[in-house]
């Protein structure tokens, strides 16, 4: 997705027991206004466990999000975006070498310390979707290389681990399909190593049949990426961002199909729905069948 959809926003996640799966699967919903939307979601889908925010560069994590997470008794997931908070990948002042050189060490330490105050646990998701050309930290633009991303991720981990005192988990989250699909931009080129991550995952969306696109089932989007990521590290797997439009198919059935994925992906630990409207598509849970499907998905308890 574009940098626009990575603006400061929030998701809430619930634990479910998916069909044919022995492990719990966290189901998340990305939302624009968590203070207003999270309580409503918790009423409609009991068992909410996570709240997640996007934080840009050296900016601090809004303490109101921590207070909200603690009040609603959820954990906090933070996606960290080392740029200036504007669209566009070509921003030389935000190249990955700046991260590795320690430009953000102070703000990362502050972020880690604040995350330690979340009572239900915290996850940090640094520099998501690096195998796309959309961001200042992407590995094929802005003077970056995949190796620069690996070095930057390791720097983030080192700083956060020291400040977090073991209370923050790190999630590595590329896009499910590399853009462009070239050998040098392969998903594996961005993997920092199994010892550097606690969780692994990918993002992907069903954009329906708009333009020259075709309807994509969840298994079509994630099966290949799941296999590739698990080959790198057999760790808990997150579908860190996803959503489906209604144009061209049945979005409620699409959500139900998410519940069947653990049968094919036994390490699947979380699914996060992008409950918002963007230029790329309208993924909001506004129609009753889709909302009901999400509610059903969120009924189970671990």
PLM features: residue spans?
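Aromatic- and acid-rich polysaccharide-binding/catalytic face
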Residues: 46-54, 187-216, 274-276
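Substrate-binding cleft of secreted/luminal carbohydrate-active enzymes
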Residues: 24-32, 121, 236-302
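Glycoside hydrolase catalytic-domain groove-lining segments
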Residues: 64-81, 199-248
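Boundary/entry segment of secreted carbohydrate-active catalytic domains
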Residues: 22-59
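Secretory targeting and sorting signals
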Residues: 1-23
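Aromatic-lined carbohydrate-recognition surfaces of secreted/lumenal glycan-active proteins
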Residues: 153, 157-185, 234-248, 270-276
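Substrate-binding cleft of extracellular glycoside hydrolase catalytic domains
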Residues: 63-172, 288
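Alpha-helical scaffolding within the catalytic cores
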Residues: 32-40, 59-68, 106-111, 176-192, ...
């Amino acid at each position: 997705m574009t940098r626009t959809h990575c603006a400061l926003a929030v998701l809430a996640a619930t634990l479910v027991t998916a069909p044919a799966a022995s492990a719990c699967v966290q189901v998340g919903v990305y939302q624009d206004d968590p203070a207003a939307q999270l309580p409503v979601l918790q009423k409609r889908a009991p068992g909410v466990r996570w709240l997640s925010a996007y934080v840009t560069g050296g900016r601090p994590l809004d303490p109101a999000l921590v207070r909200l997470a603690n009040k609603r008794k959820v954990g906090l997931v933070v996606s960290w975006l080392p740029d200036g908070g504007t669209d566009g990948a070509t921003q030389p002042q935000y190249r990955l070498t700046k991260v590795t050189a320690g430009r953000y060490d102070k703000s990362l330490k502050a972020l880690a310390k604040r995350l330690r105050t979340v009572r239900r646990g915290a996850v940090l998701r640094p520099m998501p979707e690096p195998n796309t050309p959309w961001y200042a930290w992407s590995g094929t633009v802005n003077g970056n290389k995949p190796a620069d991303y690996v070095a930057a991720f390791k720097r983030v981990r080192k700083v956060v681990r020291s400040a977090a005192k073991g209370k923050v988990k790190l999630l590595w989250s590329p896009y499910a399909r590399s853009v462009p699909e070239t050998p040098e931009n392969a998903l594996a080129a961005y993997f920092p190593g199994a010892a550097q991550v606690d969780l692994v995952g990918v993002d992907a969306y069903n954009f329906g049949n708009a333009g020259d696109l075709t309807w994509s089932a969840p298994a079509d989007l994630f099966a290949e990426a799941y296999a590739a990521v698990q080959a790198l590290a057999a760790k808990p797997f997150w579908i860190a961002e996803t959503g489906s439009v209604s144009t061209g198919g049945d979005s409620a059935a699409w959500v139900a199909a998410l519940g069947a994925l653990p049968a094919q992906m036994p390490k699947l630990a979380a699914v996060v729905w992008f409950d918002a409207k963007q230029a790329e598509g309208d993924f909001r849970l506004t129609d009753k069948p889709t909302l009901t499907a999400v509610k059903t998905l969120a009924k189970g308890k671990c």
